[in-house]
Amino acid sequence: MHNYNIFLSFYNYISSGVLLFLKIIIVIISVMVSVAYLVYMERKVIAAIQLRQGPSVVGPFGLLQPFADAIKLIIKEPIIPFKANKLCFLIAPVITFTLALLGWAVIPFGSYIIVDNGQELIVPNVIANINIGVLYILAISSLGVYGIIIAGWSSNSNYAFLGAIRSASQMISYEVSIGLTIVTVLLATGSLKLGEIVIARHNMPYWIDLLLLPMAFMFFISALAETNRHPFDLPEAESELVSGYNVEYSSMPFALFFLGEYANMILMSAMAVIFFFGGWYPPLNVSFLYIIPGTIWFIFKIVILLFCFIWIRASIPRYRYDQLMRLGWKVFLPISLFWVILVSGILVYTDSLPKNTLNNTVYYKEN
């Protein structure tokens, strides 16, 4: 009997490890494929806005264009500048790409229901359901700037170094606003677990959703700056810095920066969906909408936000650098601070602060 218990515990340990490994592989492959076709979607949408055709040669409707681009980058020769620091030059894009993937460890893609002692429990479908998920995401996004700084410094190029400095100051400036907008959500939900936040937001009164709506807009604009996307793509300003911090990169090192940028776009869109747009739940609490799996709703909402990223790139001119800094420190920071105080006061006055956090591993289904 003792040997059987040892075998059973060993089997459970191995099976849980294999399941975790499979989850990681599935998420990595999904993110990589999503990045490839996000580039295709961006080229098609911008072409449609500019009354062009876009990619249409490789495969039906140009659907194989991402694979052609990948093959082109793989077979190119990586060129390292003569006076560059070779080790730092090569490790910088790896850091950026790895950190872009690490953030997905705590993103819940959906949920499933289990029955325990006759009671239905909601469990989030996530790789690591840690109780400091929000802090983990903020830490990973903050570390992303190191890859860019190392790339700019190691290239031994004035253009690359200026782009890296711009990127560092820009990301640090807007991380403050992102953090404060997330604080307003935490005040209303009372949890740092992303799965709990989604379920708590789903069960909230509509007036709290309206109260947090301005923060959703501010979070999205700050996400544009955080990911160095248009109109805040000043670190890559072609007219001034030729290409910014990645000006000396080619072949796969350049592709890793490219993949990291677009993976961060999808990650920030997923965070916005989790914090402000209901996660994997349908947009309306109507019974027939629940027929569609929650993961489909989650992906659908992310695609809508990514379309907004692309639409803004095709429509709005680039900001000047001083305007970008002024917007971050003199507009977004005071407004987000004021909104934290306002939300706190309203929640206390209406006795709507969360009374307690939910269970660490499972979530009770609301009737």
From Swiss-Prot:
Known catalytic reactions: a quinone + NADH + 5 H(+)(in) = a quinol + NAD(+) + 4 H(+)(out)
Keywords noted in UniProt: Cell inner membrane, Cell membrane, Membrane, NAD, Quinone, Translocase, Transmembrane, Transmembrane helix, Ubiquinone
Top enzyme category: translocase
Gene Ontology molecular-function annotations: NADH dehydrogenase activity; oxidoreductase activity, acting on NAD(P)H, quinone or similar compound as acceptor; quinone binding
Keyword Transmembrane helix belongs to the record: yes
The keyword Secreted appears for this protein: no
Enzyme Commission code(s) on record: 7.1.1.-
Spans through the membrane: 18-38, 87-107, 132-152, 180-200, 204-224, 257-277, 291-311, 328-348
BP GO annotations: aerobic respiration
Localization, UniProt: Cell inner membrane
Predominant subcellular localization, coarse grouping: membrane
Pfam families: NADHdh
This protein's GO CC annotations: plasma membrane
Membrane topology of the entry: Multi-pass membrane protein
Functional description taken from the UniProt entry: NDH-1 shuttles electrons from NADH, via FMN and iron-sulfur (Fe-S) centers, to quinones in the respiratory chain. The immediate electron acceptor for the enzyme in this species is believed to be ubiquinone. Couples the redox reaction to proton translocation (for every two electrons transferred, four hydrogen ions are translocated across the cytoplasmic membrane), and thus conserves the redox energy in a proton gradient. This subunit may bind ubiquinone.
PANTHER family: NADH DEHYDROGENASE SUBUNIT 1, NADH-UBIQUINONE OXIDOREDUCTASE CHAIN 1
Family of the protein in this entry: Belongs to the complex I subunit 1 family.
Assembly behavior: NDH-1 is composed of 14 different subunits. Subunits NuoA, H, J, K, L, M, N constitute the membrane sector of the complex.
Name of protein: NADH-quinone oxidoreductase subunit H
Upper classification of the organism: Bacteria, Pseudomonadati, Pseudomonadota, Alphaproteobacteria, Rickettsiales
Gene name in the database record: nuoH
